[in-house]
């Protein structure tokens, strides 16, 4: 998934930035699924902060209306 600001301040080729996980859209199906839930190891505060700062939102860029970057300074 491309969610970065491209040329002309657009949101990427597939314009799906508003959806964090476009592959997981709700779809109607007659088949049953099994969901397995688990527990992840605890992260220390420093690890969490480093992970949060590494995302694209740290640059202040997100997809706004009409698939344009907001703000347009990426």
From Swiss-Prot:
Cite the entry's keywords alphabetically: Metal-binding, Metal-thiolate cluster, Stress response
Please provide, alphabetically and separated by semicolons, the GO molecular function terms listed in this UniProt record.
Answer: metal ion binding
Q: Write down what this protein is called.
A: Metallothionein-like protein 1A
Task: Give one Pfam family.
Answer: Metallothio_2
Top-rank taxon of the source lineage equals: Eukaryota
Q: Does the keyword Transcription apply?
A: no
What is known about its induction?
Under different stress conditions, such as excess heavy metals, heat shock and salt stresses.
Q: What InterPro entries is this protein classified in? A: Metalthion_15p
Q: Does the keyword Metal-binding apply?
A: yes
PANTHER family per the UniProt record, alphabetical: METALLOTHIONEIN-LIKE PROTEIN 1A, METALLOTHIONEIN-LIKE PROTEIN 2A
């Amino acid at each position: 998934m491309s969610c970065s600001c491209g040329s002309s301040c657009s949101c990427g080729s597939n314009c799906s930035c508003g959806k964090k996980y476009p592959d997981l859209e709700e779809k109607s199906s007659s088949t049953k699924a099994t969901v397995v839930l688990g527990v992840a190891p605890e992260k220390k505060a420093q690890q969490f902060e480093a992970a949060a700062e590494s995302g694209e939102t740290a640059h202040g860029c997100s997809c706004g209306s009409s698939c344009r970057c907001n703000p347009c300074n990426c």
